[in-house]
Amino acid sequence: VSRLKDVRAEYDSTGQRLLLNVPREWVSARVTPFSGQMARSTPHFGKGALLNYDFYTNHTEHSGGQASLWHELRYFDDRGSLSSTGYVRKNLSGGSGQQEGYVRYDTTLMITDEEDATTWTAGDVISDALSWSSSVRMGGISYGRDFSLRPDLVTWPLPEFSGEAAVPTSVDLFVNGYRAGSTRLQPGPFTLTNLPYINGAGDAVLVTTDALGRQVSTTMPFYVTSDLLRQGLSDGAMTLGSLRRNYGIENFDYGPAAGSGSYRYGLTDWLTLEGHVEGAEKLALGGAGTIVKLGRLGVVNSAWTQSKMRGDTGGQLNWGYQYSTNAFSITTQHSRRDRGFGNLALYDQPTIYDEYNQPIASLSRNTDQYSLTFNLGDFGNVGAAWIGVQSFDDQKTELLNLSWSRNLWGSSSIYLAASRDQQQGDWTVALSLQIPLGERDSAAITLENTPDAGSTQRLNYNHSMPTDGGFSWNMAWARQSQASNYQQATLG
């Protein structure tokens, strides 16, 4: 053994041990989970049925009264669940103008597979969509990934910290100044994985302590975002069926056949690929996008979609940027569309343009969103957002939103918001104070001032339903400058 290059051997006769010193590169890095991974739970299946319902009645001086009953019926066993929702409405007096009778919302059969984290759905379904595509209601079948079935899985890449220990060592991890935990290491190279869930930009400090109490600290910056998929992980769904028409008005009104599919794949820990397709008899749409982490500088997303619907072709371009820390965050999102762009959300419209070739139903031409938030510590949180939308007939909508919130004593909080319509030049202001009263009771005081309704003062008291059964109730009172005062009470 001593003849090997850079190897030193020493025999400990007392301990009957052969001690070897070998080159560092000979020792493979030991992967050490930093903290205990969330244990994968074994689902417990039962068999049964339930009925959820909500009864509501009201009476107004001018429009009369009405009563409505909403319901959810559900049957479940170890294979899945079957549910149906809807409501029945009855006009009690006067001419309220509301539709009477029964209206069905959704009837859905769902089968889940926790091992593969997938779900089969049949009946009334909603197609899967990405941040740059649209979802639609359909009657048909859907199959796709459902990570909510596996809460033990972390779908986005978490940082790994590597180093080397010469002697048995303990390691403490501090993230953004807070101690996140500790673990023990044996001599040799190491890689710490399974770190606590973190998001945004920050600094991690590794403090190693040997048996003699000597400490060495190493600072390592990181940027984590849940928008990415971990390398090798995929996500997606496919939906086939007929487009749902007049949802919430007609019970069984379905239109032409259509299909939709979305897919995401984590190519690397800093690059996630996305794709989306839609199709019908006179519609073909396809799009591709990326989410890229720029090291510690944030995340950029982009996507391009091309469509052809009833002979019209068009494109859609989306892009954005996000950056967040524990002190502030900034987000921008933008979209640009051609006039001929179409998708399933527009496909079943009776007509897209009027007799003057102006759009009746269309997506916006340009959309721009900017948001900025600051964490002021003991002084609360401040946020600002600007949204601009331009239609194909050059109509513009520009909104400015400002907000401030702060925790007060106990779990109480105060919230102040103001918004301005740039075209109208009007401000809307709201101030709200939330005060918890015990475990299940809370009170709220709200002051509002809007251009249309004037000033409004509201008092609200809420009692939530006990977990072991019972009733919940709510009482509200409001005084309005441009309308009659009102009182309201609910029992559930």
List each model region and its residues.
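Extended, compositionally simple hydrophobic/Ser/Thr-rich segments
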Residues: S170-V171, G248-E250, L273, V299-N301
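Outer membrane beta-barrel transmembrane domains
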Residues: N343-S405
